Amino acid sequence: MTYGATVAEILALANNGARLMPLAGGVCYSEEARRRIGDSKLEDVFASARAPQGALTGQYLYFSCRDEAHEVAQSDGSAEGSYWHAIVHRQEPDPGNSSYWFRRVGKHAIFPALLEGARAVEAASPSAKLDLSGVWDPFAFIEVCERARRQPGSEMEAAAMEVQRIEWQLLFDYCARRSRD
């Protein structure tokens, strides 16, 4: 999916949307990305996006610029804003606060595709113990991330990071895609 030249240039600073983000902690991955995202005008970059603020939050979060991501998500009352807000707190890590925001999300349109992607990751890494059920459960994934971050370098951490990348890609695409698509 293409989101325009500005977004492509920014995402190109870190693996074109395929970066594995840390499950917790860390600092902003790219000061240049932070600057370029901050300098771009939301109405220009995501003019016809389904959820422009959500797309902006997703860009900041992709580069682990959590303060900026949190600020934008906090001002976005949509389900997508709550979803990004939940991810910010999951990565903080603050599982209770993340759960609060996921309760505000409810059932999101990306959940079926996210479950499918997570199942593929689980099939490739069965010892990772992702504990998937018949529907995507963001609360269970918070627990997976909590366990995984306490096992640095483990198969579980790698699998959780891969699922988190899939989640980011799906949610960013959902937000940044043109509203009429």
Predicted segments with their positions:
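Conserved small-residue packing positions in alpha-helical repeats and bundles
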Residues: T57-G58, A86-H89
